[in-house]
Amino acid sequence: MDSAEVLSPSDLALAQPAKIVYLDQNKWIDLARAVAAPEDHPEDRILLEFLCAKVEAGQIRLPLTASNLYETHKLNDPEQRFNLAHTQATLSRAEVFRGHRRRLETEAALVLSKLYKMEWAEQDPDWVFSTLFLEAHMEADDPRLETPIPEHVLALMRAYPQQAMLDHLAGGPDDIRRAAISKFEAGCDALRVDIEARRIRHEGESESMRRKIYSVLLVLDQQDILIAAADRVGLPWERLKDNNGSAIRALVRETPTLLIEREIALKLEAQARPIHVNDMRDLRNFSTVLPYADIVVAENQFTNLARQAGLGDRFGVGLETDLRSLISIL
């Protein structure tokens, strides 16, 4: 190779895809404190500046999840909420992981297209990410929206995604904020109740049998999304009953969102403690980020559950608990 063709370290970094790094909410709180009071949090400030430089250089991306947005949105102290929202909107560049329905439908469609050797692919290789913050919950054109969002409003949000995220998280009427929080919490609590009831109902079963039961229940709970996935690839839903349901079993086994929820839920059920709403938020978070992140920095409990379930190896994601470890990893 001619010496003129040798890439510099900075050129080489730009030629490589940015690493996807997911931070759970407590890590974001640490960074926000380093923004507000750098002299009180010198080590976190060093890390903050390190991450800012990596984001600016295009070497990492720090997308948020619906749970991140919820946790920030629910803070009652306006100043604290603004500081955290500003930190997240700036470092994430308003990028979010898409919501449960879009992810599950697309993942299932990809699995079905491979199972049935059908010519179908998601056109956008970066489909799982969006810079419309609301798409962490549902698509902007989702027919389930009670009030459709006017196109000129969406255009403004697309033009100024960080400001749109900041305005949503830190501003707006308090009654609307509280209503959104209650709706999110209700969904998490419904999942918690289901898992607790299933744990009691199948207490004497082996883990293998509980895995089979949970697989069936997942398909039943998500069948409208799975039918939509079959429609996307042009596959009649009835075909999934072929070979005594082997396709349905493969669907649960190969669809990341379903697999992760099943495996972590089984680990949760096996613990000798009550299951809390916070567990459901973490469960949804891990189901969202594990298939698409290069590094996940989260709390000990769910990191350990994911490791025990072999999910880090399954998806090739680094599972970390110490925010400062990123300096040596990245």
What are the residue ranges of the model-derived segments?
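Long, positively charged, glycine-interspersed low-complexity recognition regions
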Residues: M1-S10, R45, G58, F82, ...
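Conserved aromatic-histidine-acidic binding/catalytic patches
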Residues: A13-L14, E39, I60, H73-N76, ...
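Non-catalytic, alpha-helical, charged scaffold/linker segments
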Residues: R93-A228
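Metal-dependent nucleic-acid phosphoesterase active-site entry motif
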Residues: D2-E43, K183-R199, L251-V252
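Glycine-rich nucleotide phosphate-binding loop and flanking beta-alpha elements
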Residues: I29, Y70, T303-N304
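Long, positively charged binding patches that form subdomain-scale interaction surfaces
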Residues: R198-R281
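Short His-Asn-centered micro-motif
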Residues: L23, L64-A66, L75, N278-D279, ...
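Extended charged low-complexity segments that act as oligomerization/scaffolding linkers
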Residues: P17-V21, R33, P38, I46-K74, ...
